[in-house]
């Protein structure tokens, strides 16, 4: 197990090897770096240096609880620490779901000096918030508070329901029950306080980072995503980022890197090879 320390928080990461360009895979909520198990072997076999890590409060990373903030500036500082610790250059960042927020915020606050390209996979940018300023958003303040309260009251029940929605499109579960249970097991590793606080971070506005982006960008999203709707996120990100490519996975739920792993991995490899 490899770790780095950012401030007082230990961040667990895995450097899976490979001599080619670095590819950093950033996991979704409430999972861990192990959620990329369908992609890591293929990327490594293609010659890339594949790096995964666990967000603070999740997986095997440190769980500072109330001693830490879980806003995206803090979370992105962990990504920046990883990039610096491993001296990753000419790297591709692949952010799934919540991980797309770190990608956009990294570009916004750190820049693109170390980057070759980026991928937003079923990702939260540009902005999920629904209010007077964002009337077409997906989540109101009441929605956020409601989810936080439900999770805090009964984490196992919340994660059971969430993973069903995570992997469903059109009312149909698109993965095996074993695959869903694997996701529940990863979610169970999360610190509940961190998981609750991260829900509030989902609705941060990432438009600034998207507008600054100049590196090649792939947006891949399922058209049946009931967690982060394509119309609110993927389509808009592709419109905001100049020259971005949009790949829509037909009948794809939120967890497309599992449900449609072959299509997802193929699209990712094709993009990275350019």
What residues fall within each predicted segment?
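Flexible "cap/lid" loop of the alpha/beta hydrolase fold
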Residues: 104, 108-109, 113-153
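Conserved loop-alpha-helix segment in the C-terminal half of the alpha/beta-hydrolase fold
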Residues: 212-252
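Catalytic active-site module of serine/aspartate enzymes centered on a nucleophile-bearing elbow/loop
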Residues: 242-274
């Amino acid at each position: 197990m490899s770790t780095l320390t950012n401030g007082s928080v230990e961040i667990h990461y895995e450097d899976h090897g490979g001599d080619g360009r670095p590819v950093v895979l950033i996991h979704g909520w409430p999972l861990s770096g192990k959620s990329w198990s369908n992609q890591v072997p293929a990327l490594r076999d293609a010659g890339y240096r594949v790096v995964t890590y666990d967000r603070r409060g999740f997986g095997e990373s440190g769980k500072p609880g109330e001693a830490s903030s879980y806003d995206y500036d803090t979370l992105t500082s962990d990504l920046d620490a990883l990039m610096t610790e491993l001296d990753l250059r000419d790297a591709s960042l692949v952010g799934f779901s919540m991980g797309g927020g770190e990608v956009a915020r990294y570009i916004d606050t750190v820049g693109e000096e170390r980057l070759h390209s980026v991928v937003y996979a079923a990702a939260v940018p540009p902005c999920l918030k629904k209010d007077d300023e964002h009337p077409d958003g997906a989540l109101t303040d009441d929605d956020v508070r409601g989810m936080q309260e439900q999770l805090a009251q009964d984490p196992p029940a919340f994660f059971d329901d969430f993973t069903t929605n995570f992997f469903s499109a059109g009312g149909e579960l698109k993965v095996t029950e074993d695959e869903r249970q694997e996701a529940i097991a990863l979610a169970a590793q999360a610190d509940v306080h961190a998981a609750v606080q991260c829900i509030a971070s989902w609705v941060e506005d990432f438009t600034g980072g998207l507008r600054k982006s100049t590196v090649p960008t792939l947006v891949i999203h399922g058209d049946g995503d009931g967690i982060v709707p394509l119309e609110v996120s993927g389509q808009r990100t592709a419109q905001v980022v100049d020259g971005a490519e949009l790949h829509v996975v037909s009948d794809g739920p939120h967890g497309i890197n599992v449900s449609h792993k072959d299509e997802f991995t193929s699209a990712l490899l094709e993009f990275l090879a350019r």
